[in-house]
Structure formats: C-alpha cells, structure tokens
Amino acid sequence: MGLIGHSADDGIGATPAVGWAGVGTVTLRELATDRAHRAARLLDRHLLVLVTVGHGQLELDFRPLQCRPGTLVWARRGQMVRYGGQPGLDAIVVCWDTSSVADAPDGAPLSDGYWQLAGEDEDAVINEVSQLVVDIQRHRSGVLAEELLRHQLTVLLLRIALLPGGATPDETGAYARFRRAVEEDFARTRRVEEYAERMGYSVRTITRACLNATGRSAKQVIDDRVTLEAKRLLAAADAPIADVGRRLGFPEPTNFGRFFHREVGVSPGAFRQAQRAIPVTPAGSTRVPLPRELPVDAAGAETARSWGRA
C-alpha cells in the first residue's frame, strides 16, 4: 500500500484520477474492482465519499465508519483508508489535487470528517456533487471549464464546512496551533518544550489547552500522533519495522518497539500481522514500499479521535 497518486512504477496500483482540471470523480464500486484499492491505502490527496446506495463500513485511520445513503466522509491527505468492498455499497468519490486546486478549502483541521446528512443539508450536498459529476463529464478542456470545476469544488467544500461539526469554534487558539505544529514536526521531536518555545507559549498553557480539548496531556497528544503514523505505515507499507521506527524518530528499533507496545498494547510486528490478516473483499491485496516521505496536511487534518488508539 502506498500513497494514492503515485505511478505504477512505484509499485502502486491505479488510483482515482483527478482529471485535467485537478478535480475528478469515480464511484466506490469502480474502485472496488481494482485489487490495489481493496487493501489499506495512504492518501496523498483529499477524497470526499458520498454514499448513494447500500450499507456497510469504510475504515478511516482504523476507525470503522458506518455507511448508508447520505453518509459523507472527508478523507484527508496522509490518512489511511480501507474501502471495504461490501456488496451493494456504492458511493460517489470526489478527489482533488491541492497543488492544482490551491484555493480549495482544506476543511476545519479539527473536524471529525464524518457526517450522516439529512434534510436540506443532504439535498444541497447531493445537488452540488451531482452537478460536479455532470460537468466533469461534459467539459474536457478550456479555461472557463477549468474555472467552473474548481469553483464548484470550492462551493461544495464551503458548504460542507458549514455543516454541524464541520467547523471548529477556535482555529487560532493554543490547542489548534499546537496540533498544527505537531503535525509538521512529530517525526522529529516529541518534546512538549520544543513546541512551546516555538509557539511562544508555556508548557502549562499548552497542556491545559490539550486537557480542555481532549482530556489528554500535551505529551499524550504528541505520542498519539506518532502512534497513529506508526500504525498507518505498519498497516500500509512493507518497509522493515526498523525503517518505520527511524522514519518516526526512533534510531534504535528496541526503543520504537517499547514505545509502540506501551501505546498500542502489542508489538509492531504483531500489529502488522493482524492488519495483514484482515480479510479483503473480494480476496486480494497489494504490497508496496514505504512512502519516500511522510505526507503532511498543512491544516493538520487528523482529528483528536483519529489520534486515539484503535
């Protein structure tokens, strides 16, 4: 498993195409026909999944999300996704490349990214997504068409940001700033003091902000983020466990093993083996190398819940 968007030369199967304008759509059923998409994958672009028919699960960062018509999931760059492939479950998947659609909102950094739409909210999102699908199929080139598709995506994402739970009251407060700083540097340092000095806060202020937001200390928030990335890479890449540890700031494999066992309750090897044993429907999986670098969502997109232990 690897980062969505790499070429076949990277050992990674076909991925959702973003199209000539940097925006694309595909159905979940179409993805499920590709063996590479039925195993755990790391995303290197944002995906919106709007369930249209059936019932089942979509796994996002080891959280099973119950899906039925009207379920909306925003999966962000760097997250681990497992589509499931349950018979009868289908969805429209909207994908976009933030490098080519630079003005597209990243979504609230602390948002859950999971909604069960109803009423006017459901109608509005369905209408926006449906029109985007139609226009992507109709318009294949041209400056005006490119602007149309990008603006439609922006409107859709802004509408989602206005959903309940789509925005966070204080995106500039101590906790939000700390989360962004951790997202940028968790593989280099796990010391709260370094983050506090960089941000101009005291350790006590950051710890208090983390406790108020999550019930966990600042050090635990950092460790949760490192643990999540370790779980992602162990589940989704085939690099030796020692390489995963070094990528996350553990020069010595034994130190990484102790850290992971303390946080998860099992060794890195046992966790990887358990993830590999998860059945894929239909049968099949793809093994690919460790990504060359950790994907970092500039908005710090992972949520407090997704940082917790699975």
Where are these regions (language model features)?
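N-terminal low-complexity or simple alpha-helical regulatory segments
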Residues: M1-G22, D34-R35
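N-terminal regulatory/effector-sensing and dimerization cores
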Residues: W20, T25-L110
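Short hydrophobic/aromatic patch on the recognition helix
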Residues: G70, I206, N255-F260
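Amphipathic alpha-helical segments enriched in hydrophobic/aromatic residues interleaved with Lys/Arg
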Residues: A108-P164, R179-R180
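A short, Lys/Arg-enriched amphipathic alpha-helix from helix-turn-helix/homeodomain DNA-binding modules
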Residues: R150, G166-M199, V221-A239, A274, ...
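Residues within helix-turn-helix
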Residues: E193, R204, P240-A242, P253-T254, ...
